[in-house]
Amino acid sequence: MSEHIKPSVMKNINAKEMVVLKDQVACLPGQIISKTLAQNDHVSVTLFAFGAGEEIASHRAGGDAFVTALEGKVEITIDDDTFVLEAGNSIVMPLGHPHALKALEDFKMMLVIIYPENPRE
């Protein structure tokens, strides 16, 4: 009797295959490239590649946003605090707090957003 296996919630990436995340997106001058790996009501996993100098203006996320720098260097402002992340560094941008990003050089990151069970929290 075969066991029923549910389909993967991951997309744009092969299952059961080793990958180097920073190689899954390319930095292009004057552009921000994104590649969604998972998206549902509970979590979002996206890879980003920023050309040097590219920015995301201050905004608020609907969940806790966990950034892991994969390559390059970025300046992240959360509320009035500024942090510089390099490859291997991570930071949490808390739910509801304004945050902005500016690539100080070509930069790649993985963004994981965890959404609250009750969006009104």
What are the language-model segments listed below?
Residues 70-71, 86-87, 105:
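A cytosolic small-molecule/anion-sensing beta-strand core signal
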Residues 56-58, 76-77, 93, 98-104:
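Short beta-strand His + acidic residue motifs that chelate non-heme Fe in jelly-roll/DSBH
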Residues 73-75, 82, 98, 108:
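Structural motif
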Residues 80-95:
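Short acidic-glycine-tyrosine-enriched beta hairpin
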Residues 95-119:
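Ligand-binding loop in jelly-roll beta-barrel domains
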Residues 49-51, 60-76:
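Short, conserved beta-strand element in jelly-roll/cupin
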Residues 1-42:
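A short, N-terminal "cap"/entry segment at the start of jelly-roll beta-barrel domains
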Residues 30-31, 41-61:
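Conserved short histidine dyad/triad with adjacent acidic residue
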